Amino acid sequence: MHDIGKITEGFQNNIKKGKRSNKHPHPLYALPIIKNIEFDYLFDIPIEVFAILSHHTQLYNNLYADYQQYKKGTFLIEEIKEFIKNSKEAYESLGFSKFFEFEDLKIEDIPKDAKPLELHRLRRKYWIEANNYIKSLSFDDKIKIKSIFSFMFSILQLCDDFASLNFSEYAKDREGIFDDVLENPEIYVPTLNIDNPISFILKDYEPYKFQKELYNSKNKFVMLFAPCGRGKTEGALLWALNALKNFKRNKIILAMPTQVTSNAMYDRLVKIFGEENVGLFHGKSFIKLRDSKEIEDEDDLEEIRDENFKGNVFFKPITITTIDHVIYSFVHGFSQADFALGNIQNSVIIFDEVHYYEKYTLEHLLTLFDILRRMDIPHLLMSGTLPNFLMNNLEGYELVVDEEGLNYKPFKLKCSENHLIWKEDDEWKVNENIINEIIENYKKGLSQAIILNTVERAREFYKAVRDKVPAILYHSQFAYKDRVKKEDEIFTLEEMRKSQNKPYVIVATQVIEISLDMSVDVMYSELSPPDALGQRAGRLHRKGKDWRENGKEYKLKIFLPYKHLPYSKELIEKTINHIKFYEKPLDYRDIKDFVDNVYKDYNLSIPSDLKLFFDEAILFGRHWTDISTIDEEGRFFKVRDDKFMKIEVVPQVYFDELGENSLRAEYMAKIPAYLILNEMKNEEGLIHFYPYEKRVGRKTRRYLICSFKYTYEIGFDYKEEEEFEDIL
C-alpha cells in the first residue's frame, strides 16, 4: 500500500521516460486513497499511515507543508481497484498468514484526482489530530507509540530500500502489476549464529568469573564494574550474544565515547566476527571505511557509501557507533533516525566507560537509559570506577563485579607539589628534574607517558623533551588523517614494546584516557579529577597485578597543574585535598573510593532536555537539520557541552598543497572557537583565518582556512589564552 500513490498518470509516464517525479509526491498522493479504505489501526491515530507518508522523507512538523510546489495527480482508477482487489492474494502468496490475520480491503470511493490544496488540508487534519492525541498521553504511552511506529517504519523502509535497489533490473521489459521483487529474504535481515560464544570469543582462554556471570545472566539491564585491561569487552560480548537468544533480538550495538574508540573497536571486532557482520558509523566513518579498503573505481566508492549507510541505520548484526549517534536516533537528529530507532528496538546495546563523560553528557545518558528501560531494550553499562553518583541514579540493574580484578594493585600513586610545566615572565619553563628522569628511564628501557591537561602545555613539554629522547605528541587538534596516522604510529610503538622490549615516550593530553590501547611503565600526569586519573592509569601497567612486577616499579606520578582549567577550580581543590590519602599502591576499589569522596556532593539534573526533544519527536518535531549537522555536531540539541566550543578549519599548508582536495573531511582539524572570535574583535579583522566557498551540487559550502603554522609533528602552533585554556 505504501506506493499506491504512484498509480497516477503523471508518475507512471515519468517512470516510462526515466524522469524524476519530485513534483508528484507519491506518499502524499496515497493519503486520499488510504483515507477511504477500512483499516483496523493499532492506535487511535493511524501510525501506519504516517509510516507511509514518511517513507521517503522523515516525519517532521512541516513535511509536505509547501504544497504549492506539487502538481495535481490523476489517479488510474481501474489499476488501483485491481491492486486493492489482489491484496488478499498477495497476503497469502507472500506468506504473511503466518504472522497476522487479514481480510480483503474495502474501499468506499476512489477520488479522480489528488489536488495539492485538498492534499494540504487532509494532511493538516491528520497532523492536528495526531498531535492533540499525543499530547493527551502519559510519557509511557508516548514511548509505546514511538517504539512501535519506529519498528514498523524500519520494516517498511528496509523492504522499500532493497526492493527499489532490485527493481530496475527486475522491471526490464515487463508491464502491469508485478509479483514480489525480492528473493532470499534472509539476506536482508542478517543474523549471528554462534554455537559456542565462550570458545568463539575467548578462544583457548578460560573465562574470568565475572565473564561467566555475564554470560549466564538472564537480566535485560546489567551494570559491569571491572578495571581496565580485564576483558570487559569480551564479557560484554558474551552477555550480548546470549541476550540475542534470551530476548529474541538480532542486533548488537556498541556505543563508544569517541570516534577514535569506535574505529579501534571496529578493527577489533572485524577480526573476530568478519567484515560482513560488523558495521561502523560516526561523523567521519566514511573516511575510516574508505581507508580500510583498496579503492579502484566509482563502484568501490559506492560500496563504501552503502557500508556507511548500513552503519547509520544499525543494519548489520553488530554496529559500532558513538553515544552521539545513538542519542540522535531518539530525537530525529539525522535523516534516517526513525529507521535507525526501529532497528534499535530489535537490538541489545553495550555502553562503554559510562562514567567517563562530563556532567552535561552524563545527564543525557542517564535520561536515555530511562527511555531504554521503558522501551524494554536490553543494555549493559560498563565502567572501570562506577561512582556512587552514577549508581544512585540507576535502578533495576543487575550488578556484576570483577572481584578478582579489583584486588590487583597495578601501580603506585605518588603526588608532588611541583609543576611539570609553568610560566615565568610569559615564558614556559619545564621541570628539568623530570626531563632528566625521563631520559634515565628511557635508557633503562622503560616506556613512559606524560599527560598534560591542555594542548599548549602538552606542545611545550614535548618541545622540551623531543631532542633528548625519541617522543611522539598526541592530542585532539590534529587534522583527522594525521590523528589516525599518529594512532597507527603509537600502535606500532606499542607492538615493538611488547615484542622487542623497545621503549617509547608519548606526550599527550587527556585524549589518551579513552582512545588508545597502550601500556607504559611510568606515567607522569598533571593532577586531574580522580575519575580522569583512573582512566589515565588504565594505560599504566595494563593487565598488571602488582605495582612491583617484571623487575620494575610501576608508578603514577602526579604534579600540580599550572592552571586549574579546563577543570573547575573547586573540583581541582577537592582532588588536592583528598589525594594525600591515596599515595600508595592502588587497586580500583581505592580509585572508586577516591572518586566517591571527591564527588560526594555531585548532583546530576535528570531528566535532561533530551526528554523534551524526545517528547517533541514522538512522531513529528523539527527537521533533522535543526537538531544536528550532518557530522552530528549539535544545533538546537547538543549531546556534548559546548563550553569549550571548537570549529573545523583546514590548515593553510594543506590548502596550498592540495587546493580544493584539502576541503575533504580528513584534512580538517578542530581548534578552539575563541581563536577566531578574538580576531573578529580586532580592528584589523581576521589575521589567521579566511573563508573559502565551494559549490557542491546546488549548494555553496563555506570553509575556514587557518594560517597558523601547522605540522604533522606538532599540529597548530598558537598561543592559548589562559582564561580559555583548552581541554584535550
From Swiss-Prot:
Question: Please, which domain of life does this record's source organism belong to?
Answer: Archaea
Q: Which residues bind Mg(2+)?
A: 3, 55
Q: What residue intervals hold the motif DEAH box?
A: 352-355
Q: Per the UniProt entry, what are the Gene Ontology biological process annotations, in alphabetical order?
A: defense response to virus
- Name the SMART domains for this protein: DEXDc, HELICc
Q: What is its EC number?
A: 3.1.-.-, 3.6.4.-
- Where the record annotates domain Helicase ATP-binding, the positions are 213-404
A Pfam family assignment? DEAD
* HD Cas3-type domain residues: 1-163
One GO molecular function term of this record is: metal ion binding
Q: Does the keyword Disulfide bond apply?
A: no
A cellular-component GO term for this protein? cytosol
Known function: CRISPR (clustered regularly interspaced short palindromic repeat), is an adaptive immune system that provides protection against mobile genetic elements (viruses, transposable elements and conjugative plasmids). CRISPR clusters contain sequences complementary to antecedent mobile elements and target invading nucleic acids. CRISPR clusters are transcribed and processed into CRISPR RNA (crRNA). Cas3 plus Cascade participate in CRISPR interference, the third stage of CRISPR immunity.
Identify its protein family. Answer: In the N-terminal section; belongs to the CRISPR-associated nuclease Cas3-HD family. In the central section; belongs to the CRISPR-associated helicase Cas3 family.
Q: What's the protein here called? A: Putative CRISPR-associated nuclease/helicase Cas3
